[in-house]
């Protein structure tokens, strides 16, 4: 098979399509700093993307290197793609065709944040950068050319649809949203469209809860009032970014004792929906009388309905993804050839300095002006001599003629005389 990429690229992926919520949690890296420190010793570029439905690792390196690294970290079961397949995967990811909720826009923001995270750890090189940025641009373009995201639901709004499905309707209900971040905002905005009695918002930062509550005309509650607020609610949707549990079974059981109407034999039913990753709600809560607990895995019914409704647009997006791949490969090879030519100029500069110093040592009485002239002359000659070769390397790479690009570079560096003519 002809090699079309000038350097190695690989992606490890684990997502909702293959693994349930609990198993997917085993693929995550709790200590991001440690992950980047270890990975950066192996790969020139590495990006980590973790969402509630997927874990993705993009590296400037080979599939074997990535697999060996993950096995060393006791992470088994990732699907690993390399070369063109890795680029195609990134395009599909950005287009929203691999999302649990087909066409959702949140993946684009998540990919941007993954880049920023890599940059903050100094692990984003020119190759990983061009991969993510090109994929994101194509994802935006595909949404503009199709209706794949028109009226599409997010994970947050899917949780609201699930609540509506399970409760019959949400008219006159009290809803508590736990978490005021991006996902909590999506949930709260989706709830605004319903005929609710009240929306409560609680968050670790009370100021953030107040801002969100003002936007949706709800009521902000301090986190220390969580359980009293649960006692008032019919549905609780939890979506914080906390690394620990927020709602515990024993405290919830005590709260349920406050949910009896006079003469009732059982507490009023409480629906809990946990869309956080890691989980916010203790799984033992499902054993508390009167409580139903739903998680990300339960959103699949909403996802399947969404996919059926967007089948035609998804097919259109797939066509556009395939059409975008050749230009993606050109952009990739352009970036990779930049690295190649940079190495070429570095090699040439070392030779220039060495030979210049030899010449100056023979001119024992050379004054600073003469030294400056010789330095300028050798520098200009080096750049002129390499200019055409560098252009040829870049042109060959962009045309996916990686073999010619590599032959040119090796021929120059090894001192071989090589003349490669292209037919017009």
UniProtKB/Swiss-Prot annotation:
Superkingdom of origin: Archaea
GO BP field: protoporphyrinogen IX biosynthetic process from glutamate
Chain positions recorded as substrate binding sites: 51-54, 99, 104-106, 110
Enzyme class: oxidoreductase
Keywords: NADP, Oxidoreductase, Porphyrin biosynthesis
Annotated Pfam families: GlutR_dimer (PF00745), GlutR_N (PF05201), Shikimate_DH (PF01488)
EC number: 1.2.1.70
Binding annotation for NADP(+): 179-184
Disulfide bonding pattern of the chain: none
Pathway annotation from the record: Porphyrin-containing compound metabolism; protoporphyrin-IX biosynthesis; 5-aminolevulinate from L-glutamyl-tRNA(Glu): step 1/2
Cross-referenced Gene3D superfamilies: Glutamyl-tRNA reductase, N-terminal domain, NAD(P)-binding Rossmann-like Domain
UniProt catalytic activity: (S)-4-amino-5-oxopentanoate + tRNA(Glu) + NADP(+) = L-glutamyl-tRNA(Glu) + NADPH + H(+)
Residues with site note (Important for activity): 89
GO molecular function: glutamyl-tRNA reductase activity; NADP binding
Active site annotation, chain numbering: 52
Family: Belongs to the glutamyl-tRNA reductase family.
Assembly notes: Homodimer.
Miscellaneous field: During catalysis, the active site Cys acts as a nucleophile attacking the alpha-carbonyl group of tRNA-bound glutamate with the formation of a thioester intermediate between enzyme and glutamate, and the concomitant release of tRNA(Glu). The thioester intermediate is finally reduced by direct hydride transfer from NADPH, to form the product GSA.
Function as written in the Swiss-Prot or TrEMBL entry: Catalyzes the NADPH-dependent reduction of glutamyl-tRNA(Glu) to glutamate 1-semialdehyde (GSA).
Domain notes: Possesses an unusual extended V-shaped dimeric structure with each monomer consisting of three distinct domains arranged along a curved 'spinal' alpha-helix. The N-terminal catalytic domain specifically recognizes the glutamate moiety of the substrate. The second domain is the NADPH-binding domain, and the third C-terminal domain is responsible for dimerization.
Protein name: Glutamyl-tRNA reductase
Gene that this sequence comes from: hemA
